[in-house]
């Protein structure tokens, strides 16, 4: 592999802005802001708006839209006679 072509991959902490959950993972992102993680080491901190810990799809708290009512209304309106 050529040197200097690939981005630097390092450990960073991603923090969910809505509920405070934190994940330690590898990323090419970097930040000047740091945080001390549960293992006692300091890592760059990336704050994100939403993660799998707070997204309604993954938490099971999603709301289903009444699509059936809309489909029936559409079919009634544009039904071929």
Swiss-Prot record:
Belongs to the bacterial ribosomal protein bL31 family. Type B subfamily. Part of the 50S ribosomal subunit. It comes from Borrelia garinii subsp. bavariensis (strain ATCC BAA-2496 / DSM 23469 / PBi). One of its GO terms (biological process) is translation. This is Large ribosomal subunit protein bL31B. The gene is rpmE2. InterPro entries: Ribosomal_bL28/bL31-like_sf, Ribosomal_bL31, Ribosomal_bL31_B, Ribosomal_bL31_sf. One of its GO terms (cellular component) is ribonucleoprotein complex. Keywords: Ribonucleoprotein, Ribosomal protein. GO terms for molecular function: structural constituent of ribosome. It comes from the Bacteria.
